Each structure stands twice: as C-alpha cells, then as structure tokens.
Regions:
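Alpha-helical membrane-protein topology signature
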Residues: 1-194
Length: 194
C-alpha cells in the first residue's frame, strides 16, 4: 500500500503539471494550486478504494486503472498541445498526425503503468510480444469510443439538452464504453494471470 500511495502522489503531481501546461490558453482560475491539491486527491481516492476493496476486491485495481487512464489522457492532450503550440498548426492533416503521435505516446505510458502497477504483471514475457497485444486492445478501445460516440450523436434523437451538451454526453458515454473494454482487455488478454 505504501508504494501505491507514493505512486498515486507521483501520478497526481505529474497530472497537475500536465493540466497546467495543456490548459494555459484557457485561463482556468486557481490552476496554480493543482500541484499541491491534485496529488492529495489522487492519494485519498486510492486510499478510499483500498478500503472499499475489502468488500469488492476489483475496486482497488480499477482505481489504479482510472488514475493511469487519467494520466494517459493528460499525456495525450499535453503532447498534442505541445505540437500545436510549437507549430501553430491547429487543423488539417498535420494536426491529425499530431493527434496520432500524442495517442501513441500515451499508449506507451499506459502500457508500462498498467503492466507494472495496475495489473502487477511482472512476468518476463517479452515486451515486444506484449506491446502489440496491448496496442491492439487500445486500438479496439479507440474504435469502440468513436463508434459509440457516432451512434449516440448521430442516431439517437436529442432530448432535454442542447446539441453541444448532447455531443459532450455522447463523448462521456463513449469513453466509459472504451474504458470498460480496455480494462477487461488488459486484464484478461494482455496481462492475464496464468
């Protein structure tokens, strides 16, 4: 638990700085408090998950998966922001290439955190054999995310909220669907206990 607590603080600290960097053009108030507050929130969340896992064992592993996923999201956005801020390119084919690069960097980060921390999979299986499986599961997760979002936004009639809110809701539901797929795929395919 002590190692996990320290790692959750590290994730929280790195995440805080990535939020500050990637949101520098958004003028978010009080963002400078994040390096102090966010690591503590991550650690408290993991401690709560630890105690909840006494009743539902999967909760603790899922909490670590969510922390890693949040970090991966921020790495994705930060790498994309770095490429956009440094080139001024905000659309077109090059911007799509930037997005592909940021996705790949986030997947590499995700692989190592999930392998060695979330799923504690320390087998000496070759990384060159595991990573393609991991990338395949992640890519299927990406396709699920886009597909669910497309169906939600384009095929389900809008009700109660405006179109922008509907699109955001679709993105949230799509992300949850992809999160479930990725968790199950990593747990039972890539890092399955033999």
């Amino acid at each position: 638990m002590k190692k996990d607590f320290i790692l959750s603080l590290i994730i929280g600290e790195v995440a805080a700085w990535l939020i500050i960097y990637s949101s520098k053009n958004l003028n978010i108030p009080y963002v400078n408090f994040l390096p102090v507050v966010f690591p503590l929130l991550c650690a408290i969340g993991l401690i709560i998950a630890y105690f909840l896992s006494k009743k539902i064992p999967v909760i603790y592993q899922l909490a670590k998966f969510i922390l890693v996923g949040g970090l991966n999201f921020l790495i994705d956005i930060s790498v994309l922001s770095l490429l956009i801020f440094s080139t001024g390119i905000t659309s077109g084919l090059l911007q799509s290439g930037f997005k592909a690069i940021s996705f790949i960097v986030a997947v590499f980060n995700s692989f190592f955190w999930n392998k060695y921390w979330t799923f504690s999979y320390n087998k000496n299986k070759e990384v060159f054999k595991e990573f393609p499986q991991f990338l395949t599961v992640s890519t299927i997760g990406l396709l699920i995310n886009v597909f669910v979002d497309y169906i939600f936004v384009n095929k389900i009639p809008v009700f109660v909220v405006d179109l922008k809110s509907w699109a955001q809701l679709g993105a949230v539901i799509a992300s949850i669907a992809a999160l479930i797929w990725n968790y199950l795929g990593y747990k039972f395919i890539v890092f399955k206990k033999e």
